[in-house]
């Protein structure tokens, strides 16, 4: 196993522990707490994949961070902080919408890279809107936290989420996953719109009403892709 992979996991575990202590003091805002929950799932997945104990890794990560801080000058810290742009966290969904459980009558699922696409193919003839919470850096989508498809009644009928065991994705990965989700939903004669925030950063639509312009052949191809993977 690569030593950098292990040490990276150890540092991530310790930094998560620090953030958790911060949250326990009721100091974190909603985006902070949301990322904390997501990162916890990611660390569990990575720990399982690497065969490493999280508690042991946290202690090792603390030693690494302490060693770095001992060598770090205040001036170097200022320069490093200034050179890294702060991501903006954009939210279409409330915490309730993000954390709500949902069920599928006809579940379909596809894994595309490090993203998992899920939808209920029992849904037909509905008006659906895609909403997402994600971070942006340099005016580009950096990290997708969660994307969900909602009917006008507020029911959740689809979702795109990062796989905890496979962290890391690009804005193109997200665009492709959105295309697959839309294709599967429109196959059942649903009308799909994309939120203004998603249109701006993740899915640029040429239609004024926010409906993505997918040609029929592409929709059929995407729907078959979903159909073939459960």
UniProtKB/Swiss-Prot annotation:
GO terms for biological process: symbiont-mediated suppression of host cytoplasmic pattern recognition receptor signaling pathway via inhibition of RIG-I activity; symbiont-mediated suppression of host gene expression; symbiont-mediated suppression of host mRNA processing; symbiont-mediated suppression of host PKR/eIFalpha signaling; symbiont-mediated suppression of host type I interferon-mediated signaling pathway. Residues 180-215 are annotated as: CPSF4-binding. It is found in: Host nucleus; Host cytoplasm. It comes from the Viruses. The dsRNA-binding region is required for suppression of RNA silencing. Homodimer. Interacts with host TRIM25 (via coiled coil); this interaction specifically inhibits TRIM25 multimerization and TRIM25-mediated RIGI CARD ubiquitination. Interacts with human EIF2AK2/PKR, CPSF4, IVNS1ABP and PABPN1. Belongs to the influenza A viruses NS1 family. This is Non-structural protein 1. The lineage of its organism: Viruses, Riboviria, Orthornavirae, Negarnaviricota, Polyploviricotina. The gene is NS.
């Amino acid at each position: 196993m690569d030593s950098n992979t292990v040490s990276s996991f150890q540092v991530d575990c310790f930094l998560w522990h620090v953030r958790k202590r911060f949250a326990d003091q009721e100091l974190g805002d909603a985006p902070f707490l949301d990322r904390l929950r997501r990162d916890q799932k990611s660390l569990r997945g990575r720990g399982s994949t690497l065969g490493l104990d999280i508690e042991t890794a946290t202690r090792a990560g603390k030693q690494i961070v302490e060693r770095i801080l001992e060598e770090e000058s205040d001036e170097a810290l200022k320069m490093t902080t200034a050179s890294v742009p702060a991501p903006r966290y954009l939210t279409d969904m409330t915490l309730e919408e993000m954390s709500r459980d949902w069920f599928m009558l006809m579940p379909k699922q596809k894994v595309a890279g490090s993203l998992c696409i899920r939808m209920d193919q029992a849904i037909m003839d509905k008006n659906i809107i895609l909403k997402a919470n994600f971070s942006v850096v340099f005016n580009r989508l950096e990290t997708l936290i969660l994307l969900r498809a909602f009917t006008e009644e507020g029911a959740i009928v689809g979702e795109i989420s990062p796989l905890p065991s496979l962290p890391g994705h690009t804005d193109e990965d997200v665009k492709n996953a959105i295309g697959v989700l839309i294709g599967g939903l429109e196959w059942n004669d649903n009308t799909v719109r994309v939120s203004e925030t998603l249109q701006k950063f993740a899915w640029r639509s040429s239609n004024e009403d926010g409906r993505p312009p997918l040609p029929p052949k592409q929709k059929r191809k995407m729907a078959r892709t979903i159909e073939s993977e459960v």
